[in-house]
C-alpha cells in the first residue's frame, strides 16, 4: 500500500512539474508579444488625437504611404503615385487590399474618410499641418484611383500623408451614424493594418491578433498584448517577473533602472539614434516671460550636459537647438546659450527682479514663482522638473510643480494656463515642416506653442517665413526660410532645448531572433520582430 502511495505521489509530482514547464513555455510563446504602456489606448479611432495613442492607431490603420528608413516615403495603400509638373495634382494608384472584416479597400472608401477628416466642422482640428490648408479638392476617379488637387505646390505632401494620424482609413462598417468620427466614436476599429483588435479593457489591456488577410508581408508574431501600467516601477517589476517581454519607448522606466538592466547579463539593452528634441516651452503670454531678458536668462540657467549625463544616464545627448543638425533645413549656425548661473542672475537683476528676505525674487509686488505641470506617468519628466526646481532655487525662483495625468496635462496646455511646460519636437516625419506649421495655426483643439508665441513682436514675421517656405519649390529658398525662423526663435528664447530624445529597448537575452527600432518614435517595430524558439527562450 505504501509503495502504491509513493508511486501515486511521484506521478502527481511529475504532472505538476510538466504543468509548470508548460506554463513557463506558454509565457514565452514565439508568436506572442507582451509589452507595457503608460496610458490607456483610447477609442482606437484613426482620425482623433488624445486620448488615442499613436502606437495603437499605427497597428490597426494604414495611410496611402508610410515613412520608411532614412526618411524614404514608401508605398502603403497606394501602390504608386504620379505628381503633375506644376506639383498641384497627386494621382494615387490604390492596391487591392482588404479590411480586417473582409471588405474591399477602394477609392470610394478613401473619399469617405477624407469627407469626415476634412469636413467643415472637423478640418479646423487639422490645420496644424499644411496639407489641410492646401487641400483644394479630391475625388475617386475609379475604384482604384484617387486624385488630390492642391491650391499651391506643397513639397511635404507625401510626408503629411505618411503621418500616423489623422489621414488613415477606416472601413465602411466602422463609421458611426452620420460618419462624423470626431463627434462620435467608431462603431468598430476596422482597418487594413497588420493587426486586429481582439479584446480590450479600458485602463487594463488591449490584445491584437494578426490580420491574416493582410495585403503585404505578415508579421512573424500572431498576437500582441499591450498592458496599461501607469507607474514606471510597476512596469519594471512586471518585466522582471516575466509578465511582459519587451520594454520599448521613451520614459517608460526610470533611467536608473535602465542602467541596472544594461549591467545585467540576463538582459539586452539598446538606445536608438536621436529621434526628436526634448524642449522646455516658456509661455511668453504670461507676465513674467513677456520680457525677453528673463527668457534668455532662463536659457542660461540649464546645465544640459549634466541633464544628459545624470538624468538620462547618457541615453540622450545635450541639445543646443530646437532640431538636431541632421534634421533637414535645421543647421542654422546658431550660437548656443552657455550654461552660466551668474550670468542668469545678472540678467534677472537687470530686468528688475530682486531677491526679497526669503530669497525669492520679486518685481512690482509680483513673486518670481513659476507654475510647472508635468505628466505623472513619465518617470523622466518628474526627474527633470525636480531638477529645475532645485537648480532655479539658486537663482531666487520659486518653482511650483503639479503632477497631472497625460490627458489633463495636454488639456491644460491648450488653455495656455502654464508658465513653463515640457514639450517636444515631433520627430520624423513631422520635423521640421509640420512642427513649424503648428506654430502658425490656431487649431480648434488648441496648440500650446501657438498660444505661448502669439504675443511675441516677431510672431507675424515667423508666421510669414514659415508659410512662404511651405509652398516654395526652390529647396535653397526653403532652407533659407527655415533657418531664418530658427534664428528668430533662438533669439526670442521661448524654447529651452534640453536633450535630443532617443527610444530605448530592453528584453531578456535569447528571447528575440530579430529586434530593431522603428523608423519613427511613435510606432512600434512589430513588423521587424521575430522571437526565438521556445526552448531557447526558456533556457535563457
Language-model features: locations:
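Gly/Pro-rich hinge or "lid" segments in bacterial periplasmic/extracellular proteins
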Residues: 163-219, 223, 341-342, 346, ...
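Structural transition elements
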Residues: 283, 318-356, 376-383
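Ligand/substrate-recognition segments at binding pockets and active sites
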Residues: 202, 354-428, 503
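Aromatic- and charge-enriched surface segment that lines or borders ligand/interaction sites
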Residues: 79-123, 147, 238, 288-290
Amino acid at each position: 500500500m505504501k509503495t502504491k502511495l509513493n508511486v501515486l505521489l511521484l506521478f502527481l509530482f511529475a504532472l505538476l512539474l510538466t504543468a509548470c514547464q508548460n506554463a513557463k513555455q506558454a509565457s514565452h510563446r514565439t508568436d506572442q508579444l507582451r509589452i507595457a504602456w503608460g496610458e490607456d489606448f483610447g477609442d482606437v479611432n484613426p482620425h482623433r488625437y488624445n486620448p488615442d495613442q499613436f502606437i495603437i492607431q499605427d497597428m490597426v490603420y494604414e495611410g496611402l504611404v508610410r515613412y520608411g528608413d532614412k526618411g524614404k516615403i514608401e508605398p502603403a495603400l497606394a501602390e504608386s503615385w504620379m505628381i503633375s509638373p506644376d506639383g498641384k495634382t497627386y494621382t494615387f494608384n490604390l492596391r487591392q487590399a482588404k479590411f480586417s472584416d473582409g471588405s474591399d479597400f477602394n477609392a470610394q472608401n478613401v473619399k469617405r474618410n477624407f469627407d469626415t477628416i476634412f469636413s467643415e466642422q472637423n478640418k479646423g482640428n487639422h490645420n496644424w499641418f499644411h496639407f489641410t490648408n492646401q487641400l483644394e479638392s479630391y475625388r475617386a476617379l475609379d475604384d482604384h484611383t484617387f486624385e488630390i488637387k492642391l491650391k499651391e505646390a506643397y513639397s511635404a505632401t507625401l510626408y503629411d500623408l505618411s503621418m500616423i494620424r489623422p489621414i488613415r482609413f477606416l472601413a465602411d462598417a466602422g463609421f458611426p451614424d452620420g460618419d462624423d468620427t470626431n463627434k462620435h466614436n467608431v462603431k468598430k476599429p476596422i482597418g487594413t493594418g497588420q493587426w486586429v483588435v481582439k479584446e480590450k479593457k479600458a485602463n487594463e489591456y488591449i490584445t491584437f491578433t494578426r490580420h491574416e488577410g493582410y495585403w503585404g508581408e505578415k508579421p512573424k508574431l500572431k498576437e500582441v498584448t499591450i498592458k496599461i501600467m501607469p507607474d514606471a516601477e510597476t512596469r519594471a517589476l512586471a518585466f522582471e517577473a516575466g509578465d511582459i517581454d519587451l520594454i520599448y519607448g521613451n520614459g517608460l522606466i526610470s533611467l536608473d533602472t535602465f542602467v541596472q538592466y544594461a549591467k545585467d547579463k540576463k538582459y539586452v539593452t539598446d538606445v536608438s539614434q536621436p529621434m526628436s528634441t526634448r524642449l522646455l516651452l516658456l509661455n511668453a503670454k504670461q507676465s513674467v516671460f513677456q520680457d525677453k531678458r528673463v527668457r534668455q536668462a532662463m536659457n542660461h540657467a540649464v546645465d544640459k550636459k549634466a541633464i544628459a549625463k545624470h538624468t538620462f544616464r547618457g541615453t540622450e545627448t545635450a541639445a543646443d537647438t530646437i532640431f538636431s543638425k541632421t534634421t533637414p533645413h535645421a543647421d542654422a549656425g546658431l550660437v548656443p546659450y552657455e550654461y552660466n548661473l551668474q550670468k542668469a542672475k545678472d540678467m534677472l537683476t537687470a530686468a528688475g527682479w530682486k531677491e526679497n528676505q526669503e530669497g525669492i525674487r520679486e518685481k512690482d509686488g509680483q513673486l518670481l514663482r513659476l507654475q510647472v505641470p508635468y505628466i505623472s506617468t513619465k518617470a523622466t519628466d518628474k526627474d527633470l522638473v525636480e531638477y529645475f526646481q532645485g537648480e532655479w532655487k539658486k537663482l531666487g525662483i520659486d518653482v511650483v510643480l503639479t503632477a497631472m495625468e497625460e490627458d489633463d496635462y495636454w488639456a491644460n496646455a491648450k488653455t495656455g494656463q502654464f508658465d513653463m511646460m515640457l514639450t517636444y519636437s515631433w520627430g520624423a516625419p513631422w520635423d521640421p515642416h509640420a512642427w513649424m506649421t503648428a506654430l502658425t495655426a490656431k487649431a480648434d483643439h488648441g496648440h500650446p506653442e501657438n498660444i505661448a508665441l502669439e504675443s511675441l513682436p516677431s510672431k507675424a514675421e515667423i508666421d510669414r517665413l514659415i508659410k512662404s517656405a511651405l509652398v516654395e519649390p526652390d529647396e535653397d529658398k526653403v532652407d533659407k526660410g527655415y533657418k531664418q525662423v530658427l534664428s528668430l526663435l533662438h533669439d526670442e528664447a521661448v524654447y529651452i532645448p534640453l536633450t535630443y530624445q532617443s527610444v530605448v529597448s530592453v528584453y531578456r537575452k535569447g528571447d528575440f531572433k530579430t529586434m530593431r527600432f522603428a523608423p519613427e518614435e511613435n510606432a512600434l517595430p512589430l513588423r521587424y520582430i521575430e522571437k526565438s524558439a521556445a526552448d531557447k527562450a526558456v533556457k535563457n
